[in-house]
Amino acid sequence: MLERLSEAFKIQRQFTENAAHELRTPLSLMQIQLDLYNSGKHPGNDADTIQTIKMLTEQNERLSKMVKTLLDMSELQTVGRDEMIIVNALIDEVLADLEPLAQEKNIKLIGKCKDVNMVGSDILIYRLVYNLVENAIKYNHYGGQVIVEAYQKEKQVYLSVEDTGSGIPEELKERVFEPFFRVDKSRSRELGGVGLGLALVNEIVRVHDGSIAIRPNPSGGTIIEVQFAVNRTTAVSYTHLRAHETSQDLV
């Protein structure tokens, strides 16, 4: 039974990867044509044409992000996960990278991180934290705050991201990590989301043999907590594989 289930998941991942690869080329060609058109002047265009071109450009960019995330999800298993990660330093970097986005909504980013190390993939854990904090900013109230906390208890690393937004309805908490699921579809479209950010987070947690949950927050907002074992494999030297500009392409 387990072998059949594993094979089914393997086929599903392969299909997703193949579909994403097939979509990438036509989307790139459309983006090139749209970029060429947008780089020129078209004084004869009426308001409807301008709006249509704008919509096509935005939707093509959205689909391109979706394809990139699907490819990332299909390739997670191939990424090495034996680096020693300085978690508090990584979180500081994420907060610095997302500070401009937070400033747009006057949101305060707060790091409460003790000296914590764990074994895993530096580039994947960065993306996990980035996606969680980015979500917490996007779905927060203007003038709110985002608190990122990391600490070690016994042989477990705990990482949590808390926001002061509207929170997630109890009946939807089990579904927020599903691909393409959105709590508020209209708001997600407005913010440019494709419904894969938390699904990618969930997959990163899975390949690190961790767990993720939404914790109760009496003061409102959302708390997402991730838990990892400190030493899931034998550690090797700490390396920083991610180029700084990688963060600009995240979903």
Name each region found by the language model.
Residues 168-182:
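Short conserved segment of the HATPase_c
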Residues 143-155:
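Short beta-strand/loop element within the Bergerat-fold HATPase_c
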Residues 55-63:
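Short alpha-helical segment of the dimerization/phosphotransfer core of two-component systems
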Residues 136-137:
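Short helix-loop "hinge" at the ATP-lid/N-box region of the Bergerat-fold HATPase_c
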Residues 101-110, 116:
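Short conserved segments within the C-terminal catalytic ATPase subdomain
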Residues 239-246:
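Conserved small/polar residues in nucleotide/adenosyl-binding loops
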